[in-house]
Design a protein with these regions (language model features):
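Oxidoreductase cofactor-interface core, primarily capturing Rossmann-like NAD(P)-dependent enzymes
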Residues: 3-115
Length: 115
């Protein structure tokens, strides 16, 4: 990627990746732990690259229109849901803000609940 001239990258992975593995419920680890581990490897690679990177770890993804109520968190346990549209909008903001380079964020929406 660096050889192609790419300078900025937003990587969207998931809750449970990297240092948030400890917060992933046992049931979720059993269901998709392997995929989370692979995403964690991608995060590790990116963190060692020369790119200006930002990592975004969404909670459980849900279809639907953006609520505008999604919140970002760093270094705190997060669970729940978030709309894909909110992840996209927030990701764009993070990508265009140079101050977020080298940072990892979780994103969830406290206004959403499982039916």
């Amino acid at each position: 990627m660096e050889l192609a001239g790419l300078k900025r990258l937003l990587l969207v992975t998931s809750l449970g990746c990297g240092d948030s593995w400890q917060y992933l419920p046992e049931r979720a680890r059993a269901a998709f732990g392997h995929e989370v581990r692979l995403k964690s490897l991608a995060e590790s690679w990116l963190q060692t690259s020369t790119l200006a990177w930002t990592i975004l770890r969404p909670a459980g993804l849900q279809d639907g229109i953006a609520t505008g109520a999604a919140v970002l968190s760093q270094g705190k346990e997060m669970h729940g849901l978030v709309r894909r549209a909110d992840v996209a909008a927030c990701g764009l903001r993070l990508l265009t803000d140079e101050a977020t380079a080298g940072q990892i964020y979780a994103i969830g929406d406290p206004s959403l609940s499982r039916a």
